Amino acid sequence: MSETKNELEDLLEKAATEPAHRPAFFRTLLESTVWVPGTAAQGEAVVEDSALDLQHWEKEDGTSVIPFFTSLEALQQAVEDEQAFVVMPVRTLFEMTLGETLFLNAKLPTGKEFMPREISLLIGEEGNPLSSQEILEGGESLILSEVAEPPAQMIDSLTTLFKTIKPVKRAFICSIKENEEAQPNLLIGIEADGDIEEIIQATGSVATDTLPGDEPIDICQVKKGEKGISHFITEHIAPFYERRWGGFLRDFKQNRII
């Protein structure tokens, strides 16, 4: 990206590594205009029911996403040949592609994947940019949500711990509660190889020592591909630790996303 990043690009960079910037990123995104690979009827303004042919790009895992970009320069960095594109407001793009997975600044060093559920929340009346979902686990209904500002000291200490435990692949944090009125607890989800009991015990010890106050905290194992809590955490929450990167990053062809 050039030295003259626009506001959205600047916030995207910040939000990729610091969750505190994510609410501002989402607010700015919804007010922004973006560049989308594809074609539209010549000379027509793009509205929700416009006839568009938007490109789908395939990720390394075989899943399909609709790419869109923060600027023309960003789009040009992601493609090798001349590329037709459509310029439109983000809200229009989200409304006309409901049910699809979209990827902001795909193939670039920093980007953001948007799952269908997250897009629905973003353009809903509540305008809530944080992932939230009610799930059934063991016959009980639980509400899980993204944490806007995780406890910094606890995250730092757990990251240091996990760097010393090779079986830990990724670690996540979210909030969990039984109903809308209940007080939420923090939940740490750990994806690891082999026996995880000792890892959970060590995590609990460090989390308890570094969490402000006497707030309760839950810890569980998550497995990609499983339903319930595991699905929500691995598909909707960005890891705060990842063995390959050791940070708040996931990868898309070796690039980072929120």
UniProtKB/Swiss-Prot annotation:
Protein's name according to its UniProt entry: Protein SseB
Organism domain of life: Bacteria
Gene it is expressed from: sseB
Known function: May be involved in the enhancement of serine-sensitivity.
InterPro entries: SseB_C (IPR027945), SseB_N (IPR009839)
Cystine crosslinks: none
Residues annotated as signal peptide: none
